[in-house]
Structures are given as C-alpha cells and as structure tokens.
Amino acid sequence: MIEMYDRNYIYNMTTKIMNRSVQAHPFHLVEASPWPIAVSFSLLVVTLSGVMTFQGYSNGLFLLTLGFISLVSTMTLWFKDISREGTFQGHHTFAVQKGLSLGFVLFVVSEVFFFISIFWAFFHSALAPTVELGAHWPPAGIETLNPWEVPLLNTVILLSSGATVTYAHHANPSNRAGVIYGLIATIVLATVFTGFQGFEYYNAPFTFSDGVYGSTFYMATGFHGIHVLVGTIFLTVGLFRVLSYHLTDHHHLGFEQAILYWHFVDVVWLFLFISVYWWGG
C-alpha cells in the first residue's frame, strides 16, 4: 500500500513538472535569461576596447580580443538555451514560429537600413568631394586597395559559401550527410574569408583615421565583417543541431533563418565590392 502511494505521488509530481515545462498556449513568452545583458556588456567591451585600440592604448587589443571571446561565448550559450526551449520543451509552436519568422525578417530589414546609412555616408563624400578632400575621390594622398586581388578573392569565397549553404538547405531533410557537408564547407569558407579580411586590414596602406575615406571604408567593411562572424556562429549552431538530430521536416526554423542571414551577408558584400572597392577605389 505504501509502495502504491509512493508510486502515485511520484507520478503526480512528475506530471506537474512536465505540465510546467511544456507550453500549452501559442504565445511566445520568454523566460528570465542572463544572456541579453551579457551580450550587451560584451558589445560594450568590444566598442570601448575598439576605440582604445584606435587611440593607441597599450591594453586596447587585449581587451578587444577578450570582448570578442565573451561575445562569442555568451551568444553560444544563448543559442543553447533557445535550442532547449524549442526542441525539448516544445515552446516553439507553429504560432510562435510565425512570430519568430516575422521578427527575424524585420530584424534583417533594420540591418538593410543600417547598411544604407553607411553607403549613404560613403556616396555623400564620393559623389561630391569637398575642397578639403582636394575635390577628388579618392582623396589626395590615399593609396587604395586593388579590387582585383584580395577583394575579388574574398568575393569568390563568399559567393561559393552562398552556394554551399544553398546546397545544405535543399539537402535538408532527406540528405542528412549533404546538410552536414554543406554547412561544414560554408563555415570553412566563412573562416577563410575572415582570415583574408584580417590580412587585408593588416596590410592596408591607410587607416581608420585617414580622413573620410578611411573611416567609411573600415566602417562599411568592418561592420560587414562583424555580420560574417555572427553568421558563422549562427551556422555553427545549426551544424551542431543537425549533428544532434534536433531538426525535423517541420521544425528547422533556426536553420532557415541562418541561411537567410547568410544570403543577406552575401548580397551586402556584392554591394561593398562594387561600390567601395571597385567604383570608389
């Protein structure tokens, strides 16, 4: 009798715990999470240390590296929580996925307008250079980069990564090996692109402080580089979720959003290559 009581008690308590964790409504109610404030603090460290590095402070580069490590770590942990909520706790119902899709599309639209503001600043100076710039673009004394060397190579690399991620998208879910190989190829190409971008920055004949050309160039390409870093993390999380059998025919929203984000990064780079490297140089 006592064993039966204990068994019923355990069953009732387990049922209560499961009912608390399983979502019974279609609304996206987020739980308390430390990651938004952690990501915000990491971005603050990256911003401040970036300014310190530009100003020549001795510990600026160290703090910048520390900030990037903190940003990548907190984003990874945040992705882990989102995967748990969507895959194991059932929080991402079809209604919630609709809302998340709309929110992500609006986020990409806001990013489009951010890049429009950067291109606006570039073309504002390039189309009507002032007397202080020598009434000429590029400004007098600026030695620009050859667009047919590293920039062209990076263009080929990034477009190739767009092709491999599209292959992974179309391989899902019937060809799991194709998804894995496509994502691995995309991540490798993204890493190579970032490496060449850093090589280009290191060997560039001008700096961020070299007038409006240097500031707009590094702002445009650097902000795009940050998006490449975020997209690489996004795709890496998608790869780990594929390897962990998290994705199904009807439940792979994060995977699709990562692909959409990567295509956005591809398109922005094409505009950067044509306008900043080729036409503006």
Curated annotation (Swiss-Prot):
Gene3D superfamilies: 1.10.287.70, Cytochrome c oxidase, subunit III, four-helix bundle
Location in the cell: Mitochondrion inner membrane
A GO term for molecular function: cytochrome-c oxidase activity
Regions crossing the membrane: 34-54, 59-79, 103-123, 148-168, 179-199, 220-240, 259-279
Main subcellular location of this protein, as a coarse class: mitochondrion
Record keywords: Membrane, Mitochondrion, Mitochondrion inner membrane, Translocase, Transmembrane, Transmembrane helix
GO biological process, one term: mitochondrial electron transport, cytochrome c to oxygen
One cellular-component annotation, GO: mitochondrial inner membrane
Membership in a protein family: Belongs to the cytochrome c oxidase subunit 3 family.
Name the record gives this protein: Cytochrome c oxidase subunit 3
Lipid bilayer topology: Multi-pass membrane protein
Highest classification ranks of the organism: Eukaryota, Fungi, Fungi incertae sedis, Mucoromycota, Mucoromycotina
EC assignment: 7.1.1.9
Family annotation (Pfam families): COX3
Subunit composition and interactions: Component of the cytochrome c oxidase (complex IV, CIV), a multisubunit enzyme composed of a catalytic core of 3 subunits and several supernumerary subunits. The complex exists as a monomer or a dimer and forms supercomplexes (SCs) in the inner mitochondrial membrane with ubiquinol-cytochrome c oxidoreductase (cytochrome b-c1 complex, complex III, CIII).
Provenance organism: Rhizopus stolonifer (Rhizopus nigricans)
Reaction equation(s) it catalyzes: 4 Fe(II)-[cytochrome c] + O2 + 8 H(+)(in) = 4 Fe(III)-[cytochrome c] + 2 H2O + 4 H(+)(out)
Function: Component of the cytochrome c oxidase, the last enzyme in the mitochondrial electron transport chain which drives oxidative phosphorylation. The respiratory chain contains 3 multisubunit complexes succinate dehydrogenase (complex II, CII), ubiquinol-cytochrome c oxidoreductase (cytochrome b-c1 complex, complex III, CIII) and cytochrome c oxidase (complex IV, CIV), that cooperate to transfer electrons derived from NADH and succinate to molecular oxygen, creating an electrochemical gradient over the inner membrane that drives transmembrane transport and the ATP synthase.
